A protein has these predicted regions:
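Alpha-helix N-cap/loop-to-helix boundary motif
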Residues: 51, 62-69, 73, 121
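A short, terminal or domain-edge coil/loop segment
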Residues: 1, 56-65, 85-99, 125-130, ...
Length: 186
């Protein structure tokens, strides 16, 4: 489906209340699904029902609308990287925008304002790994998690950019990932 915002229709020179009412009536007709205040979904229907976008897709759409950057953190980052099978009950993201809590459909999302350094990574893997490892903690990384990190690093296509990302990480993370790089013979 497609995520729509009231602001997407501002070029129609319409009053925001009029646009909101029009979207609301489309929702009542079943043409749209309201995900949150001012956030709608034009549903994609399959024989199994409505296909909803992932939380990540919804959060990134909201970030684009707000001209903010977002970065998954905590259990959300662990889950995305496959370092945890635990599905978050609350999805947590760092943001360059304002802190807030959102309810997107039946999912809870927390956006936490963060420092620019967290958005300076050149690769998505570098940024996600730092947040995931921070969540685990230096002393709590299992052999299985190291094997998954090894797999992720070996599959990274932008290895030089990823190596540059290491300088943004704490020393203990740098050492861990450098050891993994050394086993890859790069």
């Amino acid at each position: 489906g497609q995520i729509l915002f009231i602001s997407d229709f501002s070029d129609l020179n319409g009053n925001e209340k009029v646009i909101s009412r029009a979207l609301s009536s489309e929702e009542k007709r079943g043409n749209l699904i309201r995900l949150a205040n001012g956030v709608y979904l034009r549903p994609k229907n399959t024989r199994f029902g409505v296909v909803y976008p992932s939380v990540d897709e919804m959060v990134n759409a909201i970030a684009r609308r707000d001209r903010a950057k977002v970065q998954p953190c905590g259990v959300t980052a662990l889950n995305i990287l496959g370092l945890s099978t635990q599905v978050p009950t609350k999805y947590t993201y760092l943001t360059s925008g304002s802190s807030r809590k959102l309810k997107l459909g039946n999912r809870l999302v927390e956006l936490k304002r963060s420092v620019p350094k967290n958005f300076a990574f050149k690769t998505a893997l570098g940024a996600l790994l730092m947040q995931a490892l921070k969540s685990l903690g230096e002393k709590n990384i299992s052999k299985q998690e190291i094997e998954q990190i090894h797999k992720l690093v070996s599959e990274e296509t932008q290895k030089e950019a990823f190596k540059q990302d290491l300088s943004l990480m704490p020393i203990w993370m740098r050492k861990l990932i450098t050891n993994i790089f050394n086993t890859l013979n790069l």
